[in-house]
Curated annotation (Swiss-Prot):
Keywords: Ribonucleoprotein, Ribosomal protein, RNA-binding, rRNA-binding, tRNA-binding. Binds 23S rRNA and is also seen to make contacts with the A and possibly P site tRNAs. Belongs to the universal ribosomal protein uL16 family. It comes from the Bacteria. GO terms for biological process: translation. This is Large ribosomal subunit protein uL16. One of its GO terms (cellular component) is cytosolic large ribosomal subunit. GO terms for molecular function: rRNA binding; structural constituent of ribosome; tRNA binding. The keyword tRNA-binding applies. It comes from Thermotoga petrophila (strain ATCC BAA-488 / DSM 13995 / JCM 10881 / RKU-1). Gene3D superfamilies: Ribosomal protein L10e/L16. Part of the 50S ribosomal subunit. InterPro entries: Ribosomal_uL16, Ribosomal_uL16_bact-type, Ribosomal_uL16_CS, Ribosomal_uL16_dom, Ribosomal_uL16_sf. The keyword RNA-binding applies.
Length: 142
């Protein structure tokens, strides 16, 4: 699973997911990308499930780039514990994703295979996504 090697602070506040993504909104490395259309927390397990699904769809050919990293810890209190007594233990790691963020990129495979691989990855995610080509800005090609 993806997670930071070490962090300055073990626990974080939840924060808010307002607005659109500031960076990472264009396909930079591959030929096709998977773009988020909704805000969400994507867990390390979901990212790994997407990676495996794409590898299977691409039959281990081509290259995959994961453009998000789970760097935010999320905590959970034990079941049936009363309120208070401090913040819960770190349960896992999430990547904060805002609309417009490119999640995954693929290259080295034909268009049909790339679309299929990214569609499989999208089925593992809890948000709406769309497949975008490398040079796609608005409606025109660059």
């Amino acid at each position: 699973m993806l997670m930071p090697r070490r962090v300055k602070y073990r626990k974080q506040q939840r924060g808010r997911m307002k607005g659109k993504a500031k960076g990472g909104t264009f396909v930079q490395f591959g030929e096709w990308g998977l773009k988020a259309l909704e805000p969400a927390w994507i867990t390390a397990q979901q990212i790994e499930a997407c990676r495996i699904a794409m590898l299977r769809a691409m039959k281990r050919s081509g290259k995959i780039w994961i453009r998000i990293f789970p760097d935010k810890p999320y905590t959970k209190k034990p079941p049936e514990s009363r309120m208070g007594k401090g913040k819960g233990n770190v349960e896992g790691w999430v990547a904060v994703v805002k609309p417009g963020k490119i999640l995954f990129e693929v290259a080295g495979v034909d268009e049909e295979t790339a679309h299929e691989a990214l569609r499989y990855a999208a089925s593992k995610l809890p948000i709406a996504t769309k497949v975008v080509p490398r040079h796609h800005i608005g409606g025109e090609a660059v």
